[in-house]
Amino acid sequence: MTQKHILSGDLLVFHDDPFEVPPEDAVQIQSDAALLIENGKITARDSRDILIAAHPEAAHHPHPNRLICPGFIDAHVHYPQTAMIASWGKRLIDWLNTYTFPEEMRFDHPAYAAEISARYLDLTAAHGTTTMAS
């Protein structure tokens, strides 16, 4: 059975690259808009009223006066270093030897690796990051 949800509010929509064209041509805020989410994937974007009328079986999650944005992309991550965020070192080699290498050696234990990866994913999702590359 398909699970359908409608998430409504003001949508931030990119039509083009804001570094290539004037920002006013690249980005738009659509008021009273909505996203249709089916089985966890966005399948449609339209006005709130149109999507609700077309999908009366969908659960509606209104977010008036809220801006719904695309997820952030982090193109370079070091998830094994999650437990040592903000650790201090005088020089890079000191920092690597004192914090990074010992911490990354702990990932030899699957339970520890699973714990830190879950913490990392929770932190990134809580801050709006939906895509990461290492």
At which residue positions do the language-model features occur?
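Alpha-helical scaffold segments that flank or form the walls of functional sites
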Residues: A86-S134
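Structured catalytic/translocation cores of nucleotide/phosphate-coupled proteins
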Residues: A44, H63, F72, Q81, ...
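N-terminal metal-binding scaffold of metallo-dependent hydrolase/deaminase domains
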Residues: M1-A54, R66-L67
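Short, exposed beta-strand "edge-strand" segments with a Pro/Gly-rich flavor and a Y/T-containing core
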Residues: V27, G40-D46, P56-H60, M84-K90, ...
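Generic, ordered loop/turn and secondary-structure boundary motif
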Residues: V13, E20, Q30-S31, P80, ...
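Surface-exposed beta-strand edges and their flanking turn/coil or helix-capping segments
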Residues: E20-P22, E57-H60, A75, N97-Y99, ...
